[in-house]
Each structure stands twice: as C-alpha cells, then as structure tokens.
Amino acid sequence: GRTCVAAGARLHLIEPIGFQINEKQVRRAGLDYWDKLDYRIYDSYRDFVEKNPGIKIYMATTKARHVYSEVSFEDDCYIMFGKESAGIPEELLVENQENTIRIPMFGEIRSLNLGNSVAIVLYEALRQHGFENLNKQGNLHRLSWDN
C-alpha cells in the first residue's frame, strides 16, 4: 500500500486477500497512510476483469519468460502480483503468457519479497513515463542545498 501511495498508483485487491482492511494488525503495521491509499477490492479475478474492461494486464511471476525491464509499459496498464505464498494461479499465467514478466534473480532463489517486487516493477513503469506527476527533487529539513 505505501508503495502505491508514494507512486500515485491505485491498488486493486482481488479476494481472497487473507486479511481484513480494518484489522487492528494491518493499521498497526505502519499503515498510517491508509487514508491516502486509492484502492478497490474485487470478489474474484472475473469481477476485476468485468469492472475494468479492455485493460492490459502484465502478470509478474518467477515463472515468466520475459524480463520486466524489456516491456514497454502502457500508460494505463495494470501490473498484477499474486499472493506472496503462492503467486498468480498458473491457469491465468498460461492464458496470458505473452504478458507475463519476471525479475531476474541469481541462482535458485524462490522469489523476492512481494513488496520489493512491486516496487521494482512499478518504478520501472514510472521511469518509462518520466516519473510523471511525482516529486523528482527532495528538500533538506534544517539546511538548504544552496549552501
């Protein structure tokens, strides 16, 4: 969620997500930005597709043949990630194999942390579009860069 807020991206959650949005533990996990998060929840993958007709979906998986950085992300595309424990169902991957992408990894590592994977791929898509609408320069708290 925090990565989506920082990137100005909408988070789409497809049930079952394994937690309740209003759970005390979720809020306690540092989600003080939750009120700034633009998110939607769908009952199923079919519900998601029906409510977002004609969309281009890239599916991030360790099983893909294409590297994420070799894709030209469209401005209005969606990037799908599966559950950290199981990934995206293989039936969906086979149906969408030309749009599956992976992050290269060394050796036989199973996968990266889900949040890290989202950040890597999302920020590549944003980079390709010049980080449009994002702050590209930070400010010091006590001093000025001009000193």
Label the model's feature ranges.
Residues 1-147:
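Post-transcriptional modification and biogenesis factors for structured RNAs
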